[in-house]
């Protein structure tokens, strides 16, 4: 079990924002350490939590890696983005990248299909598919980007455990992972990890191997689920603290007014 965890698994995300991906931060840091992708592409970003985790890893390991995220920041049936939220998210994430990850992270505000023209074939070492979550969309996003994958690449699929609201990623994941080197985390809405081509021998290849004992798979899931809960708990604590402060300030103002001497 020790080879499936390292100090990278305990890295703390520098950008913690509302995200269904929060609990996968620990695995993302470990994955980046193992794979050291020279080019990572994320399809679907919103507030950029996972994207920032990838960038943070590259910066810490000090190797020539690039991370590109692609999104229109206009939202869809599953994103919950309305009005000008997309513009605000994009601006906030761009500011974060400018401040912390110049030369590493790049935002492309366009459609996934249009971004294909900006990436060379056979160069993507890590592809993260997290766009619209209908079956056909997940399939299209994956298949249209396959030619961009490097000979030893890994593809991530988020929301593999969600089966309501029209989500169909779980169906597509069941198809592409059947009999293939892969691993699925069940916490954090589910995260599928699919091997493309042949990986170099090592812990990552062992984790994705079909011969990995089921008991070991359960232990790995439990380990990373426990680590992920810590990040989610921190986010919830900060969220409730902000709400408390927002409600407390008006009360403090009223108390101050009541404490003032009465004047006729």
Regions inferred by a protein language model and the residue ranges of each:
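S-adenosylmethionine/decaboxylated-SAM
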Residues: 2-243, 253-254
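Helical coiled-coil/dimerization "stalks"
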Residues: 243-264
């Amino acid at each position: 079990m020790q080879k499936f965890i390292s100090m990278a698994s305990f890295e703390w995300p520098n950008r913690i924002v509302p995200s269904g991906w929060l609990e996968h931060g620990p695995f993302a840091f470990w994955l980046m350490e193992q794979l050291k992708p020279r080019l990572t592409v994320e399809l679907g970003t919103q507030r950029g939590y996972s994207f920032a985790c990838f960038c943070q890893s590259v910066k810490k390991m000090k190797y020539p890696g690039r991370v590109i995220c692609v999104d229109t920041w206009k939202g869809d049936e599953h994103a919950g983005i309305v009005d000008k939220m997309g513009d605000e998210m994009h601006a906030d994430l761009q500011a974060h990248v400018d401040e912390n990850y110049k030369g590493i992270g790049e935002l492309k505000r366009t459609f996934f299909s249009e971004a294909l023209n900006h990436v060379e074939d056979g160069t993507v070492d890590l592809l993260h598919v997290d766009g619209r979550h209908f079956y056909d969309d997940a399939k299209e996003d994956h298949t249209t980007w396959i030619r961009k994958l490097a000979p030893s690449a890994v593809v991530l699929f988020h929301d593999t455990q969600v089966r309501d609201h029209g989500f169909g990623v779980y169906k597509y994941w069941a198809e592409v992972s059947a009999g293939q080197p892969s691993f699925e985390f069940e916490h954090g809405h589910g995260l599928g990890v699919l091997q493309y081509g042949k990986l170099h021998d090592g812990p990552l290849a062992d984790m994705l191997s079909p011969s990995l004992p089921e008991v070991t798979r359960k232990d790995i899931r439990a380990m990373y689920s426990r680590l992920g809960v810590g990040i989610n708990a921190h986010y919830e604590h900060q969220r409730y603290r902000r709400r408390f402060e927002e409600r407390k300030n008006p009360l403090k103002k009223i108390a101050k007014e009541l404490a003032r001497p009465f004047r006729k």
